[in-house]
Amino acid sequence: MIFRNRILTLAALGAALGPASIAAQDQWLSETSCSDVAHAIVNEGITARNNVEHGRAKGMYQAALVVDPNCIAAKIALADMANGSEWGTRSSQIAALADVSGTPSEMAWLEVINSSNGPNSSYKMAQDMPDDALFHYWGSWSENAGSALDGHMAFAERFPSLAGGSLNTLAYAYAQGDGVDTDEVKAREFLRSYLRLYNEANAHDSFAEISAIFGDYEGAVRHQQHAVDRGGATVYGERVGMYWRLANKDEYRQSVVDAVDVLANPDAPEEETAAVLSDQSVMCLSSMVPCSVMTAAEYMATANGTEWLSMSANDVDVMFNDMMTRAVATHHNTGQYMLDGQTVDYSVRVSSVWEITNQGVSLITANWAPMGGAGLPGS
């Protein structure tokens, strides 16, 4: 009951603050060398970064330097975002800051990004800098803070207007059973608090993903569309299609079965056959001969070269990958064809891989293996 009361308290705080109150509440850094405007922009950038919106964060840091070219916090923030020392520019950017003289908050940040263990270093800084939320937030992941769950609960209570990232972390913990029992109700409570506090792209992206975890694909599509609206299709667009396909998984399964039936029907109209083939499909036999890359026209010419008496696909089983971009179908094709004036009983085990798009399904590759009868004609 005590823990649930803490959740309800956080939910109430999120409802009371709202997104418009963030700038007026706690600052990530208590003092910077930047002008007031540049400081505010850096603060928004840190909020974006801690909410996994790195492109938006980088734009904020760059904007702060346009306003104030001497804003050390923005320079440190850009260095902190850079890639690692092996191939990126992080080392050179940090080296360029070696002789800077900033505020205690800025110098502490520089020390953190130079350390070998950021969370532990941040936790240590937080003990000496109680008003600098940045170090308290990063320190939430330190083993010195106890469990990450406890660390983020404590941060959300201490810095409620900056708690978006922590609320997000807590929502995922309950959605995925990370250190706690899976609990959809609690996960959604944290999500709603997160959304009230930070109505931006990542909040909707998280709401979509967690909705999908619990099978609510329609809700996932709706929130992912909001994420695209706020953060652009480049980062968030792919998942809209994925959730839409998951919401229509049964229809896609039937589409694959129907496509298999078309290819197993020697009397299917050519336009129907061509519609389920890719521009080039890889066709393989289990006899270890090289596979053939065929256009739709080449495949149909080969299929039409056989005098089929009958053919059908049986026991079709369809499996999808997690992203719903590929399907694997396995089935047993049976029938008869004429060869040198003789009737041949046809029986093969077929496995095929299909591309799944919002427009439909198309064959990528297929393999035929004789199973209790003759395989494909030698032609």
Which residues make up each language-model segment?
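Alpha-helical segment of the N-proximal tetratricopeptide repeat
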Residues: 34-63, 67, 106-121, 131, ...
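Residue-level recognition of tetratricopeptide repeat
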Residues: 37, 71, 131-135, 162-163, ...
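Glycine-centered coil turns and helix-coil junctions that link the paired helices
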Residues: 44, 51, 78, 82-86, ...
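Canonical tetratricopeptide repeat
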Residues: 77, 138, 169, 206, ...
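Alpha-helical repeat scaffolds
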Residues: 88-101, 119-128, 147-159, 182-195, ...
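Short, low-complexity N-terminal intrinsically disordered segments enriched in polar/charged residues
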Residues: 230, 239-275, 279, 377-379
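A solvent-exposed, acidic/Ser-Thr-rich amphipathic alpha-helical stretch
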Residues: 269-325, 345
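Short beta-strand edge/turn micro-motifs at domain boundaries
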Residues: 347-378
